[in-house]
Amino acid sequence: MRLLSILTTVFLVGCGGGGSSAPEETPTPAPAPTTQNCNVFVTKGPYPQIWPTVEWNTASLESQGMCPDEVQSVIDYAFLEGNDTGAIIVIRNGYIVIEEYDSGKTENDLATSWSVGKSFASALMGVALEEGLVSSLDETTGQYFPEWAGTERENITIRNLMTLRTGLQADCLGPPNDFDNGGNSIYFSLDQVACALNRELQGPIGEKLYSYSNSDVMLAGEIMEITSGMKLDEYLDQKLGSIMNADYQWWEDAFGNSLGYCCIDATPRDFGRFGLLFARNGEWDGQQLIPQSWIELSTSLALNGEYGYYWWPINGHDGFVAIGLHGQTIAVIPEDNLVIMRFGNYSRLGDGSTVRVGTNGHSTSQPLSYDITSFINRVTALIR
């Protein structure tokens, strides 16, 4: 009975004695736990890895290892007046942790890729190689393009197209020695494959005369259509989109040529599925949709600070980013299981079936003060 006696005594003392009329004090609540340099408690990993199904899962920033203290500054930066941002989404560990839309926009509204589409073309090339539709990156392209037969151009390889080392003029409609504009004039050509083929060598094959050429990518896309027997959007849907529950619409020119270098329309959430696929090394919920070896090769130049295989480097981060005109962004930082996206307000002109026929086309605008690296840095600064 000694233990009971001690406990009873302690209880009475703690209550101010057996018959005391002293008022009880209301206990002060313990402060909510916080994390260093954050006003709330941030959960530390490891984090469960989930996959979106038809719908996405959302989670708080702090539950996924990110501090929400400065999240409003991230949103304010993206949507600063004059930036004409339509949507931003941040995905961590498979959860959407930030999602904001411009006034009047919802998760169901389309965004457009512009040159973010190049990274989709790169992914499909990896699939085509895995399936044996393309035997090697070192295949010469003359077998696909009879227009080049009997000329030195027939020795250009698929790898040359993928790394922008064809030696051809960059712009199919501009001056032959203009290597600075990325060949943007091809967008205004009715038959864009013919335009891309109608370029002459300006230097040795394998020499990097420029860092960017829409025409080179257009031809890489054409090779995938020839070898697969499908339009790019059909091949994309069969190999990636339908499996990931994503709907991608790839634009064509007036001659029915898919624009491999640009112009995919999808919701921002569906673009996020593509980013997550690369954050997870080409795996989607147990299926290896893109060979891991291709993920490693196609992002290797970007991880070493050079544009190649249609991915850009991210300054200061061990990741890679797909970039499109007017600040379209899908940034992937695999070590943080992080996807960061920004899309501009998008108007789809005409009936959306082709580009530059009648009133059909794209409409986005140049943001006044949006910088891709600054935006990425603001998001990654939330990680604890």
Question: Which positions does each model-derived feature cover?
Answer:
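Active-site helix/loop module of the DD-peptidase/beta-lactamase fold
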Residues: E131-Q169, L201, S228-A266
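Active-site SXXK
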Residues: G94, A111-L137, L161, A220-M224, ...
